[in-house]
Regions:
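Short, small-residue-enriched loops and turns at beta-alpha junctions
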Residues: 7-8, 51-52, 82-83, 107-108, ...
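C-terminal cap of metal-dependent C-N hydrolases
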Residues: 249, 259-298, 303, 307-311
Length: 311
């Protein structure tokens, strides 16, 4: 479960609730832990995050968040040009927390230094960061050429051109991670929603801020796989790998998830023609998606209610 930049007490409460959900178990998809996306960013490429709530990196603060998460804090995203960033990266990595770099104006060398210090990769590559340039490759260039950097991609047909998806496949191959970056409007009708403290609007499935910038997506992970195949001409096996085994390897849990193998947990989808979903199994039990229809209700449309800091 991914958080969004919010006041620190809300983030603390959310990490606690996610930890409770991991411990008690939830119906449907398996909750593996939390992905802290914010508040350790910089303003230039803030996206839909509220820069007034950005914070400086502080080891005692990170330790408190880890304690509240009770071992379920899986990933922390941060901007690599922040003060004390290398110390923070080393601290998090030493505590088995992955560090992803994004929402940042960092240059190539700063990004490479963070990756060399143990950072894991880039948050939604190309989005929320300095663009690739032939005289300053920036974060994107560093991520593409670093041999161990994992690169997240939002393959929804809006965040990235199909040619960029192909470029990433050519350069990074098995280091690509398909993500949705989906927010609460996913699966819902067009209308106004809240993302953190920001009011956003969805039209034809595309979510934008009042200023016109993209604000997350309404993508599904299966839709991302389908788009990689149909829009970017990526082989199906490669696209499935980007949504299954590659993320499991990035998180260090490929010994039990991410592929079908003796001794691994039986989480799988059965797909039909045009990659249409037919069956779902979680931990070996078939799941009926119809049981979760109450989750997709008009109650998620914004009528002035406060948004949870989960995306």
């Amino acid at each position: 479960a991914t958080t969004v930049t919010a006041p620190l007490p809300q983030i603390e409460q959310t990490l606690t609730r996610i930890a409770d959900g991991v411990t008690s178990g939830m119906p449907g998809a398996q909750l593996l832990g939390s992905y802290l996306e914010g508040p350790y960013f910089t303003p230039e490429h803030k996206g839909a995050h509220d820069q007034a709530l950005f914070r400086e990196l502080d080891i005692p603060e990170l330790e408190r968040l880890q304690q509240l998460a009770r071992g379920t804090l899986r990933v922390v995203a941060l901007a690599p040009e922040k003060p004390r960033v290398l110390e923070a990266i080393r601290h998090l990595v030493a505590n088995d927390v992955r560090v992803m770099l994004g929402h940042s104006a960092a240059d190539h060398d700063t990004t490479m230094a963070a990756l060399s210090a143990g950072a894991t990769g880039l948050v939604h590559c190309f989005n929320g960061m300095r663009s690739l340039h032939h005289r300053e490759p920036g974060m994107v260039g560093a991520g593409l050429i670093h041999p161990h950097a994992w690169l997240e991609l939002i393959a929804d047909g809006h965040h990235l051109h199909s040619g960029v998806l192909r470029l990433c496949h050519c350069c990074a191959g098995e280091r690509l991670l398909l993500i949705t970056d989906a927010m609460r409007a996913a699966g819902m009708p067009d209308g106004h929603y809240l993302l953190g403290n920001h009011r956003v609007e969805m039209k034809a499935g595309v979510v934008r801020t009042e200023a016109g910038g993209l604000a997350g997506s309404t993508l599904t992970l299966l839709g991302a796989v389908r788009n990689m195949v149909q829009l970017a001409d990526v082989p199906l096996a490669d696209a499935i790998h980007m949504a299954s085994l590659a993320p499991a390897r990035m998180l260090g849990i490929a010994d039990r998830l991410g592929s079908l193998s003796v001794g691994k947990q039986a989480n799988l989808l059965a797909l039909g023609n045009e990659l249409a979903q037919q069956h779902i199994w979680v931990a070996g039990r078939e799941i009926d998606p119809a049981c979760f229809s109450p989750l997709f209700s008009e109650s998620r449309v914004s009528h002035g209610a406060q948004e949870s800091p989960c995306i």
